[in-house]
């Protein structure tokens, strides 16, 4: 049963609802009155539903697409101002025990040279990134016993402690595997900016095909991670 407020993956992600939403959007891609109504709601910052968002994505009316783009810019500037915030990825380790079919880091890739950065190497990388002008990083690591939460936390401390040319990294975002409530608490206490977790698909059947083995193959555990965080 579809329940957007549920913390159970099988309830807040419903394949039937997703398919119906896509069909509804395609059926209304030329519905000018409906699309204008949705854009009016968006401009008033009243929020739109997932079905309404899908209709905007499918919109096939050029003039309304132009209105949509202009509105998106205005809303962005209203909320964030006239700026774009960028961050640089910092890969700590490509050791991984998962079998993601789209990723060269997958565990069965025996031709890849595996590497985990030492704290000294991390410090060197941070200095190089600062010299390029970066003040925000996204910490990346494969899922592997070597890349324990202790290693991640130590790496975060190292990054924040690098003082270079009277500057330092202001924000460390973290992109690591789905983990426990306790570990998310530790990340928050370490002062991270944003926790990032990619969900390649919400279709369970396709998810299992893309993730045939390893901890990430657990669809529910991965999909429910943001509720734990």
Spans of features found by a protein language model:
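Flexible, acidic/Gly-rich N-terminal and inter-domain linker regions that tether
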Residues: 1-90
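Generic, ordered loop/turn and secondary-structure boundary motif
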Residues: 49, 76, 85, 91-97, ...
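Core AdoMet radical
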Residues: 107-123, 128-229
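Generic detection of intrinsically disordered/low-complexity segments and helix-coil linkers/edges
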Residues: 6, 18, 96-99, 201
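Canonical Radical SAM [4Fe-4S] cluster-binding loop centered on the CxxxCxxC motif
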Residues: 81, 85-121
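Short, well-ordered coil loops that connect the C-terminus of an alpha-helix to the N-terminus
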Residues: 44, 81-82, 98, 165, ...
